[in-house]
Amino acid sequence: MAAVSAAGLLTSCKEKQDPEHYNIVFIMTDDHTAQMMSCYDNRHIQTPNLDRIAEDGVRFTNAFVANSLSGPSRACLLTGKHSCANGFYDNTHSVFDFSQQTFPKLLQQAGYQTAMIGKLHLEANPEGFDYWEILPGQGDYYNPVFITMDGKSHSEKGYLTDIITDKSLDWLENMRDKEKPFCIMIHHKAVHRNWLPPLKYLKEYEHRTFSLPHDFHDEYKGRRAAQKQRMSISRDMDIVYDTKMHHAGSDTPLTSTYEAFISRLDPEERKEYDAFYNALTADFMSRDLKGRELTEFKYQRYMRDYAKVVKSLDDNVGRVLDYLKSEGLDKNTLIVYTSDQGFYMGEHGWFDKRFMYEESMRTPLVMSLPSDFNTRGEIDELVQNIDFAPTFLELAGIDVPDDMHGVSLVPLLEGQHPEDWRKSLYYHYYEHPSEHMVMSHYGIRTERYKLIRFYYDEDFHELYDLLADPHEMNNLYGKTGYESVTDSLMNELARLQEKYDDPVRFGADKAGNVR
């Protein structure tokens, strides 16, 4: 494991700048997990530019999301509230209500220039931004369509991660009033499924054999929700859509979707793309893999393509960092890098997210701080994506509304360790039944324990001791000797549900409807 040194977190003794002068550059990716970021875990790949942010600032070791799904996570970010309060529960039925309070609106009202570029995925056009240009839905990796503020759509030629960065740098250089503070939200589609890499990196990592997670062949003993999921690399990863093994006669559930995606490449791009993947496909077809060999082949293809997309992402983060430094903006700018949630890289034999288990609830979070913050190293307190909104508001000198669920991270950025800092986090995932068939569930995570209640067509609990069982393989709920721990966690769960006014505390029927 590679990590930024935790030696001696320091608190600045300097007089801070007038808060109105702090800028905010918020870079968020989709499904980028800490396992594939070398300042967190250097087993797989190197991410030198992302690591630069941590080296120049802080790395949060216990950063989590409140609902591990793209749209709901983004709603939590904007509002500083859990899904039960912001109204965006899932990606299938929810539409975000932009008439509600969001931190960009409050920044805008205080004189900040605000911009949003890239993936929004909230089924509504953004409000609270002086400038925005967003993707429709998930967007496309190649030659993508953008929606502009006039409501029109247009295509852009190129690779999406490059284009979003180009547009962001153009706004920073040419479109903002340089006399005013700003907040720009740079939202990448990368590293979302199905991990289409840029042409220049097609051959990267092709000679790398990635090690299997120790629980890759997990049998899910004692964990009923894990048994019911549909996100298994072995069973559910599509050989065409996900691994690009596309050949004449291909007929998988997602073959037509894959063909639509790659149809966006122009003839020259398609020629290079097909030459690469057709050769891999021919080799794959000649091997006639089955069983565990096929599953492990799919894992290697998944890891290689995911790593290629991350490499492109890291390059583009470096472009933003270089620009900010060249313009002297790094000295009074908070630079944040995070993901909308974590992701499974073969742990438990899975891809995707959704579960409250560690790999998907946890998210990478690094920040490069304005020059008058001297704090460097690791921050170990429990933090959550509902904390971004109050943090940005306090940094801008704006009063944090009382109805926000999150808490400002500014004391932690100043090197403090408040004694009254939260000791537990609340989580609630709603989307079921859905594509990956992860049951609706809620729960709490403390420093040591995690308690989860699954509900819908079944109703049961799981309990994990994260110190003794960090990979969450041994469900302790109902086991002798854990009665006191369970009671304490149940009480804390009830307290948080009341605090956040989650109506699920009044019960849910077998159809998953809150009552």
Report each predicted region and the residues it spans.
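Formylglycine-dependent sulfatase
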Residues: 1-455, 459-461, 470-491, 495-498, ...
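Residues forming the ATP-binding cleft of Hanks-type serine/threonine protein kinase domains
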Residues: 467
